[in-house]
Amino acid sequence: HMGYTSRNRVEMVRGGRKFFSRLLQLIEEANHSVHLQFYIFIDDDTGNTVIRSLQAAAARGVAVFLHLDAYASRELSQKSVDELRESGVQVKWFEPLFKSRHFYFGRRLHHKAVVVDGFRCMVGGINICDRYNDLPGDPAWLDMAVYCEGEAAYIVYHICRQMWPEKIRQPALAWKEIDDACSSIPQTDWKEVRVRQNDW
């Protein structure tokens, strides 16, 4: 496990509307890359809104990577996957050792994370579908995410990056760029953050 990093700005984000507003804002403000890893991603109203945002990012030249659990996201339609790929979004499935429609055996991708430009990230327990969003007459399940800018986000970025094969071209983010960005965080805002990875 990695040690603690200190140059981080941290904020708790409540699930539902606040989470999805922040998620869309992050994608819309991306300049270089967007990495998303999610356990459940369904192309309902919420999922389709995120899909459109990812497609718009890819259209303006941002490198977009979507990594999903093959079993938990099996309701995502092939049509949506094809449209994402056609728009330039890289889509990858995390496959178990054995699966059928009602059973799986093996490791799962339980990550729920987004990283933008190697400097901003949001990690939590919120999946991409309507039941995690605040819809009219149907409030979201109570869940939280941590939003982070700084060194810890760069570690999460590398975790996401390393899960893609080398043949997939990814923009290289030099540490100096992140170091310069971290320097913009006032020291009074610094929080110590330790990144721990568990994909079971």
Indicate residue ranges for each PLM-predicted region.
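Charged, low-complexity intrinsically disordered terminal segments
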Residues: 1-200
